[in-house]
Structure formats: C-alpha cells, structure tokens
Swiss-Prot record:
Residue list for modification Phosphoserine: 103
Highest rank taxon of the organism: Eukaryota
Full protein name: Male-enhanced antigen 1
Signal peptide positions on this chain: none
GO BP annotation list: cell differentiation; spermatogenesis
Tissue specificity field: Highly expressed in testis. Transcripts can be found in primary and secondary spermatocytes, and spermatids, but the protein itself is only detected in spermatids. No expression in Leydig cells, spermatogonia, or sperm. Very weak expression in the heart, kidney, spleen, thymus and ovary.
A Pfam cross-reference name: MEA1
InterPro entries per record: MEA1 (IPR009685)
Organism, scientific name: Bos taurus
Chain residue ranges for the region called Disordered: 1-78, 94-122
Gene that produces this protein: MEA1
Keyword Phosphoprotein: yes
Comp. bias (Acidic residues): 38-48, 65-78
Length: 174
C-alpha cells in the first residue's frame, strides 16, 4: 500500500489522531481553555443502592438457603390424576366458563327458544359429517401439553363430566 506525501506530511490514522508523544504543530494544537471535552464537572458515580436514571433501583434476590422446595407428588391412578389435572386446569384458567345465570321470571317457552337459538340445527347426517371431520384433526405434538398426553379420552370425559356436575350442584352466587 502506497503512502501519499503532501507537503512533506504523511496522511494516515497516526496523523489524524496523533498520540501524546508526538509534538503538535501550531496549526494542529488545541486552543487554550479547551483542554477538556466539556466544561461540565465530571459526573459522580451513582451509589450501588441508589436509584438509577429512571428512578429504578437494584433489588437483591432472596438468597436464604432455607427456601421451601416444592415436592412433586408421584403420579397416582384414576381419581388422584383427575383431581390433580382439575387443579392444574383451574390454576391455569382453562376451566369451563360459568353457565349463564337463569332467571326465575323466564317461562319454559322462552328458555327453550333461547337454548335452541344458541345451537345450530343439524340433521343426523350432518352431525356424523362433523364428527368424522373433527376426528381427522390432529394437533402437532408440541401443541399438546404433557398433562394432556398423559390422559386417555375416558379420563378426560370423566374430568369434564365432574366439572359440569360440580357447576350444576354449586349455588349461583353471582
């Protein structure tokens, strides 16, 4: 790589940003009074426990060695598994929604019309078509949670039936 010589001076990074050991000529030296980059006083470092620029501060995590550890219960059979799964479903907010509140003022015809209004009328042929179509649908393996893979269809139906019965037996508080 060739160096271009202009007026006896070489141009390169060492000339643009000279180091402290080189002498600066009169046209290259800093003017008086501009020794610092800014006229402001150097900023003081913030204390470790002090608030940051947005008002946030460091909050240390609990380091106690006597922390409670969660023990996983061994997987049981039947009702234990169903109860455990029901608890998980409720904790995740995946439980069935509350049934609509029934008014005592409604007459039977109005209630029947309301129930029929929310359902789609289908003949038995159409019902079978929907069942076959839904049976052909499969979710990808990562889309199915581990607890759902552990349940058989019969166990899942039992969970749903128990949840429905519990809702029907529970008094309407709302």
């Amino acid at each position: 790589m060739a160096t271009v010589v202009l007026g006896g001076d070489t141009m390169g990074p060492e000339r643009i940003f000279p180091n402290q050991t080189e002498e600066l000529g009169p046209h290259q030296g800093p003017t008086e009074g501009t020794g610092d980059w800014s006229s402001e006083e150097p900023e003081e470092e913030q204390e470790e426990t002090g608030a940051g620029p947005a008002g946030y501060s460091y909050q240390p995590l609990n380091q106690d060695p006597e922390q409670e550890e969660v023990e996983l219960a061994p997987v049981g059979d039947g009702e234990d598994v169903v109860a455990d799964i029901q608890d998980r479903i409720q904790a995740l907010g995946l439980h069935l929604p509350d049934p609509p509140v029934e008014s005592e003022d409604e007459d039977e015809q109005g209630a029947t019309a309301l129930n029929n209004h929310s359902s789609i009328p289908m003949d038995p042929e159409h019902v079978e078509l929907v069942k076959r179509t839904m049976a052909g649908i499969s979710l990808p393996a990562p889309g199915v949670p581990a607890w759902a893979r552990e349940l058989s269809d019969a166990q899942w139906e039992d969970v749903v039936q128990k949840a429905l019965q519990a809702r029907q037996a529970a008094p309407a508080w709302k």
